């Protein structure tokens, strides 16, 4: 098997005991499987939950707290205990664990986005295991990833991972709830995630986590948009992850062979950069952007909204108000209003670097309906 870069996400339900606390036996089982993958020559990045589970007991809570303040306090205590457990377990196999705590704002800045990529790449080159969790102690609702499922998809995307493995306590996706319908049939393979599947999955997670099957499907669809194949399922023992990569996993494989991966710059534009404004284009420009792979020129712009600057990211909508894409502009809003609808040669004097394009094709991302929201 060729060397692969794999992102493994372990949720709270796969790390906890019946009372909701951290289960060290479960944690060691995951570590042993990751260590075995690394011994086979693969790069592995671990996305882990479990900080709240590790911290609520030592903090004096009888059960997992339900308030935001309680969860954040438990996470503040539990994150160091969680990393201590991982570091100790990986050391038994000769591997060094590295902690990275992220918030949504770490992805907004392109410079921080690049620095994160460089840091993780350097850790992998030196044989370490990057262990990533959301910084639950400081994250506020507006800045969170929603759950670590989505965080794992975003990390898998910008690292150009070959596979995203979402480990859970259910062995894959079914056409009905297997806990209530004994006739439910499991999907061994799915080429894509549809709106109907997400709707049917509901939104309720386990008592010890914030996710659920719906969040995993949303994360899987995001990963697929980056060109990353996905596995959702379960397993135990040293070879469970190796078996998943070999196509023998107990779960559902999602995606197509050899998907086209999205460039890191375009990932940042599409999913992470703050959107500073909106440009409306005519039908000719829409067709050029979507069907002919062209750049957006001033002549095709009919309206400009927002107070954006050159090199900001803006949404592009058609004449019906439907978002068709997102891109980095060479014109400030005030200048673009002056030159909209005019030929490029007349407009370029107002452009950053005197470019003829409003948005160059290299700085453009077409957005499908399901990819518009962050």
UniProtKB/Swiss-Prot annotation:
Its EC number is 2.7.2.11. It is found in: Cytoplasm. Keywords: Amino-acid biosynthesis, ATP-binding, Cytoplasm, Kinase, Nucleotide-binding, Proline biosynthesis, Transferase. Its main location: cytoplasm. The keyword 4Fe-4S does not apply. Pathway: Amino-acid biosynthesis; L-proline biosynthesis; L-glutamate 5-semialdehyde from L-glutamate: step 1/2. InterPro entries: AceGlu_kinase-like_sf, Asp/Glu/Uridylate_kinase, G5K_ProB, Glu/AcGlu_kinase, Glu_5kinase, Glu_5kinase/COase_Synthase, Glutamate_5-kinase_CS, PUA. Residues 276-354 form the PUA domain. SUPFAM superfamilies: Carbamate kinase-like, PUA domain-like. One of its GO terms (cellular component) is cytosol. It comes from the Bacteria. The keyword Ribosomal protein does not apply. It is an enzyme of class 2 (transferase). Substrate binds at residues 49, 136, 148. One of its GO terms (biological process) is L-proline biosynthetic process. GO terms for molecular function: ATP binding; glutamate 5-kinase activity; RNA binding. ATP binds at residues 9, 168-169, 210-216. Belongs to the glutamate 5-kinase family. Catalyzes the transfer of a phosphate group to glutamate to form L-glutamate 5-phosphate. This is Glutamate 5-kinase. It comes from Geobacillus kaustophilus (strain HTA426).
């Amino acid at each position: 098997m060729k060397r692969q870069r794999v992102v493994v996400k372990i949720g709270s339900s796969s790390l906890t005991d019946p009372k909701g606390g951290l289960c060290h036996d479960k944690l060691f089982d995951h570590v042993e499987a990751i260590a075995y993958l690394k011994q086979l020559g693969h790069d592995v990045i671990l996305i882990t939950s479990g900080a709240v589970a590790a911290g609520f007991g030592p903090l004096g809570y009888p059960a997992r707290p339900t308030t935001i303040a309680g969860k954040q306090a438990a996470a503040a205590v539990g994150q160091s205990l969680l990393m201590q457990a991982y570091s100790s377990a990986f050391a038994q196999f000769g591997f060094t664990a590295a902690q990275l705590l992220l918030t949504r704002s770490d992805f907004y800045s392109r410079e921080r986005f690049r620095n994160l990529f460089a840091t993780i790449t350097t850790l992998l080159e030196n044989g370490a295991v990057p262990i990533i969790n959301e910084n639950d102690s400081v994250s506020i609702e507006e800045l969170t990833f929603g759950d670590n499922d989505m965080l794992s998809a975003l990390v898998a995307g910008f690292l150009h991972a070959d596979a995203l493995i979402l480990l859970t306590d259910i062995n894959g996706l079914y056409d009905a709830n297997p806990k209530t319908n004994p006739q439910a049939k499991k999907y061994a393979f799915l080429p894509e995630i549809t709106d109907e599947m997400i709707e049917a999955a509901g939104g309720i997670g386990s008592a010890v986590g914030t996710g659920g099957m719906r969040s995993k499907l949303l994360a899987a669809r995001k990963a697929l948009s980056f060109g990353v194949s996905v596995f959702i399922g379960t397993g135990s023992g040293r070879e469970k992850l190796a078996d998943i990569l070999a196509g023998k996993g107990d779960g559902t494989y999602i995606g197509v062979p050899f998907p086209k991966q999205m460039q890191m710059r375009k990932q940042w534009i599409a999913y992470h950069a703050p959107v500073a404004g909106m440009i409306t284009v005519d039908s000719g420009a829409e067709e050029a952007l979507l069907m002919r792979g062209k750049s957006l020129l001033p002549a095709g712009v009919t309206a400009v909204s927002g107070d954006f600057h050159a090199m900001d990211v803006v949404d592009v909508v058609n004449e019906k108000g439907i978002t068709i894409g997102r891109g980095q502009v060479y014109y400030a809003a005030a200048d673009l209003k002056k030159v909209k609808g005019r030929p490029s040669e007349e407009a370029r004097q107002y452009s950053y670097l005197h470019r003829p394009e409003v948005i160059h094709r290299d700085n453009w991302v077409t957005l499908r309906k399901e990819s518009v929201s962050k």
